[in-house]
Amino acid sequence: MSVYAPNRQTIVPRVWVGCLACYNGGELVGTWYDAVDADRVLPEDIHGCPTTHEEMWVMDHECMPVRGELDPATAARWGHVIEAEAPQWREAYLAWLDDQGIDRPEDAPDADTFSEILVGEWPSFSDFAEMIVADLGILDGLPESVSNYFDLNAFARDLAYDYVILDSPHGTVWVYQNV
């Protein structure tokens, strides 16, 4: 089976780690880090000098399938889970996690499991269905007088029940196994 796989810019999950004591005191003190490093950020890293403030908190994030704030250890686990995925499929991975309502890193499939779930990316689901017809040879050997009656749109409509289909932000669709 062929797979349409465009070259995408790599998604790197990032987090804004801030000092919780400063935040509670009305001051925003923090900076952006790669999510995989979130659990290693020290108060001294944020403040630039030794401090009595001990609690760090992730107050904002990018490219992560969670809503709202989270602790640095969870952010780091998400970072590792997402970065384990092939760079060209991270965007599809995040979309699928969101669609499935997965909001804890321990519930997310690992890269090997996701590679079995993700079928690929196509310009449309009809293009995917057309590829299935060709790859399986559904119309091979049929006379043209018979194959002309094959309704690809109806086939694609029925086939869609067997898959999860998500629109990508690039005008294409991601196709996943229905698990």
Identify the residue ranges that each predicted region occupies.
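N-terminal ordered "arm"
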Residues: 2-52
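Acidic, proline/glycine-rich low-complexity IDRs
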Residues: 4-9, 19, 129-179
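A broad, low-specificity signal marking well-ordered, structured residues that form hydrophobic/aromatic
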Residues: 15, 31, 56-57, 164, ...
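A broad, structure-centric signal for solvent-exposed, well-ordered loop/edge residues
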Residues: 24, 40-42, 65, 157, ...
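Residue-level signal for secondary-structure boundary elements
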Residues: 25, 54, 90, 105, ...
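Short coil/turn linker and secondary-structure boundary residues
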Residues: 37-41, 70, 120-123, 141, ...
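Structured domain cores in non-transmembrane regions
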Residues: 40-106
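Extracytoplasmic/secretory-pathway segments with low complexity and glycosylation-like composition
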Residues: 93-137, 141, 145, 154, ...
